[in-house]
């Protein structure tokens, strides 16, 4: 009797020992320590991991998750996550993830500074030349591969910016940059400390190696509200104005403003003449696009909440097209009389500019994403369209069959407005993710060619803005990528 009672008590004690969270924690620590102490030949599977995987992620994936605790892969033990209360609690999953991402970013920056990037094994200039001589590569493929090789060897260099107000350069942060058609000017929007935005134009014609120096022309009168969307506009001549969609502030409604580039001193010497600022009362504009199509000459479009507004700058005539969702992205086709729109609902549709806004005949094409569309780009032959959304999907659509023919993997986006940069001459696609990494894909086979970490720590306020061109600084310029982040401008030029 006493023996059975003793065995029952022993079983009960062992069961309560296992159910107590403190003992579970200690057992997990012991198991973790024992795993860490195993010899190297027992962990051979871990050596096969991809080099892009962070050490923190690899460490936490092999240990069980305990509610209310997190595992530190460096110290190899669990720590308690305190519930929300008045005291400051630095131990959160977000802070842990941020720390892992920062350590990965610093590691990639060190790798970039230490050696040149190689796109893939056996991919070098000598092998490409030999294949071309043997007839295995035609001229087109050889040019594409040569561009890819030079792209993989781009090195980061800081650009020295000069201005009439040097003190502002140290405090104002870049919000976005936008190169003009010839890539000899860069329109900039900078966030100022007191609130609002300041605009400037950087002359890129002086952007030459080895000394990368540029001058920023500013017009301090135009310190204004938050910019929702911006594009170059060709009213008097090519890229004579900048079209801005501004948010409303207090009792001041939102508007679309045509800002003459001539108002920035010496922005385009010899061509620009003093111009007038034109402002159109268009509240709540999410996106804008300028038309170079002869069917909509001197016109621009704005994407609003549940409608598209087409405005003629010269006559002031307007056409309104009703939609079922907010229009977040727009672009005019050049040859076909079409305006493509991307919506918050995930729908992409085209407006036939020859039709009026009466009836439903103006919807020419309809495509669908699973999330809000943030960017649409029409390829030069106007038979394909590139679109990205807030789920991080980038798809290439065939407009003739309305089917997705290619998808570009790796982009990161959850809720931000992030543009796409398509460069068919170089055969590449460039996009900056919400994780602050700039990714470059091959346009032809969707292969990820390069991932560039941000020079600044990743944050929502410091997502880089980029501009890629085959001729940075004008017709005699070299191909390269400009990246604006924080107060700095960087150039990734072909070596």
Curated annotation (Swiss-Prot):
GO terms for cellular component: Cul4-RING E3 ubiquitin ligase complex; nucleoplasm. Residues 24-34 have a biased composition (Basic and acidic residues). It holds the Pfam family Beta-prop_DCAF4. Residues 51-62 have a biased composition (Low complexity). SUPFAM superfamilies: WD40 repeat-like. Residues 1-17 have a biased composition (Basic residues). GO terms for biological process: protein ubiquitination. Interacts with DDB1 and CUL4A. May function as a substrate receptor for CUL4-DDB1 E3 ubiquitin-protein ligase complex. This is DDB1- and CUL4-associated factor 4. It comes from Homo sapiens. The lineage of its organism: Eukaryota, Metazoa, Chordata, Craniata, Vertebrata. The gene is DCAF4.
């Amino acid at each position: 009797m006493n023996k059975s009672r003793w065995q029952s008590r022993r079983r009960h004690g062992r069961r309560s020992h296992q159910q107590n969270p403190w003992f579970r924690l200690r057992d997990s620590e012991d198991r973790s320590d024992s795993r860490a102490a195993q010899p190297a030949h027992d962990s051979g599977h871990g050596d096969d991991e991809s080099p892009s995987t962070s050490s923190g992620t690899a460490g936490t994936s092999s240990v069980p998750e305990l509610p209310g605790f997190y595992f530190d892969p460096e110290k190899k033990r669990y720590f308690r996550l305190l519930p929300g209360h008045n005291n400051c609690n630095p131990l959160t999953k977000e802070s842990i993830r941020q720390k892992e991402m920062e350590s990965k970013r610093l590691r990639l920056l060190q790798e970039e500074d230490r050696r040149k990037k190689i796109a893939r094994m056996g991919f070098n200039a000598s092998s490409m030349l030999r294949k071309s001589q043997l007839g295995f590569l035609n001229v087109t493929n050889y040019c594409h591969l040569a561009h890819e090789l030079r792209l993989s060897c781009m090195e980061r260099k800081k650009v020295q910016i000069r201005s009439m107000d040097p003190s502002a350069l140290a405090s104002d942060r870049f919000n976005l940059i936008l190169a003009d058609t010839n890539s000899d000017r860069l329109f900039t929007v900078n966030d100022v400390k007191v609130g609002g935005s300041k605009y400037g134009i950087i002359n890129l014609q002086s952007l030459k190696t080895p000394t990368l120096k540029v001058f920023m022309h500013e017009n301090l009168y135009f310190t204004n509200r938050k910019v929702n969307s911006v594009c170059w506009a060709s009213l008097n001549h090519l890229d004579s104005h900048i079209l801005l969609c501004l948010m409303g502030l207090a009792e001041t409604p939102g508007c679309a403003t045509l800002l003459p580039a001539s108002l920035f001193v010496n922005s385009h010497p010899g061509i620009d003449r003093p111009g007038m600022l034109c402002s159109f009362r268009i509240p709540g504009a999410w996106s804008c696009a300028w038309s170079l199509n002869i069917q909509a000459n001197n016109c621009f479009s704005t994407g609003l909440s549940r409608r598209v507004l087409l405005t003629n700058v010269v006559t002031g005539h307007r056409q309104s097209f009703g939609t079922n969702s907010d229009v977040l992205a727009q672009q005019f086709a050049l040859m076909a009389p079409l305006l493509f729109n991307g919506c918050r609902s995930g729908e992409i549709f085209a407006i036939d500019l020859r039709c009026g806004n009466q009836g439903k005949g103006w919807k020419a094409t309809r495509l669908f994403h699973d999330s809000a569309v943030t960017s649409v780009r029409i390829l030069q032959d106007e038979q394909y369209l590139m679109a990205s959304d807030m789920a991080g999907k980038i798809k290439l659509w065939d407009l003739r069959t309305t089917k997705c023919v290619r998808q570009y993997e790796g982009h990161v986006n959850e809720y931000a407005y992030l543009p796409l940069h398509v460069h068919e001459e170089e055969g590449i696609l460039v996009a900056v993710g919400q994780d602050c990494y700039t990714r470059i894909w091959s346009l032809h086979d969707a292969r990820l060619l390069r991932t560039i970490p941000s020079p600044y720590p990743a944050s929502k306020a410091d997502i880089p803005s980029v501009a890629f061109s085959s001729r940075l600084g004008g017709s005699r310029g070299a191909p390269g990528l400009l990246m604006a982040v924080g107060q700095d401008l960087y150039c990734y030029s072909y070596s």
